[in-house]
Amino acid sequence: MMNFQQLVLASHNAGKLKELQAMLGHSVQLHSIGEFSQVEPEETGLSFVENAILKARNAARISGLPALADDSGLAVDFLGGAPGIYSARYADGKGDAANNAKLLEALKDVPEAERSAQFVCVLALVRHADDPLPILCEGLWHGRILFEASGDQGFGYDPLFWVPERNCSSADLAPADKNQLSHRARAMALLRKRLGLA
């Protein structure tokens, strides 16, 4: 069991910071990398795992603290796993609304039965920048892509992601519900076990 009282999150995304802090609980204080640097590392990996490790090492190097990185995205089966690791930049960095519009366009004539997808989250935790044994935890959240946006909670692709176990979109879920069901929640549950917090 490892004891981490402070971690730096390798993200400038306030929504992600809030979500992960709620899942971690109060025994660990999560800092944003934005407290140390505004520079985003180049995500040169070809997988969620590679990018999560790269971001965690970069955050540990900049902050001097143990670092937690999340690399997550949406993998749509009909699109061969796209947008995948490019989820945040799917519409050339133009933001959530543009990403959602591009996804709907890509699936324009695709029937409901072929719109299966999963949110993927890989968490990487490093004790220091050169940690030879990062802790890796993966969470998957299976659903499908809607034909139009629904709900106003969450961020990213949440308004387009149908959650079969709740019969609504991810953006229709209250944050507390999402924090129990999501890909990030599943990965975080594994991480909490690894850290002896569960």
Curated annotation (Swiss-Prot):
The keyword S-adenosyl-L-methionine does not apply. One of its GO terms (molecular function) is ribonucleoside triphosphate phosphatase activity. This is dITP/XTP pyrophosphatase. Substrate binds at residues 11-16, 72, 155-158, 178, 183-184. The active site is at residue 71. It comes from Pseudomonas putida (strain ATCC 47054 / DSM 6125 / CFBP 8728 / NCIMB 11950 / KT2440). One of its GO terms (biological process) is purine nucleoside triphosphate catabolic process. PANTHER family: INOSINE TRIPHOSPHATE PYROPHOSPHATASE (PTHR11067:SF9), INOSINE TRIPHOSPHATE PYROPHOSPHATASE/HAM1 PROTEIN (PTHR11067). Mg(2+) binds at residues 42, 71. Its cofactor is Mg(2+). Binds 1 Mg(2+) ion per subunit. InterPro entries: dITP/XTP_pyrophosphatase, ITPase-like_fam, RdgB/HAM1. It catalyses: XTP + H2O = XMP + diphosphate + H(+); dITP + H2O = dIMP + diphosphate + H(+); ITP + H2O = IMP + diphosphate + H(+). Homodimer. Keywords: Hydrolase, Magnesium, Metal-binding, Nucleotide metabolism, Nucleotide-binding. GO terms for cellular component: cytosol. It is an enzyme of class 3 (hydrolase). Pyrophosphatase that catalyzes the hydrolysis of nucleoside triphosphates to their monophosphate derivatives, with a high preference for the non-canonical purine nucleotides XTP (xanthosine triphosphate), dITP (deoxyinosine triphosphate) and ITP. Seems to function as a house-cleaning enzyme that removes non-canonical purine nucleotides from the nucleotide pool, thus preventing their incorporation into DNA/RNA and avoiding chromosomal lesions. Belongs to the HAM1 NTPase family.
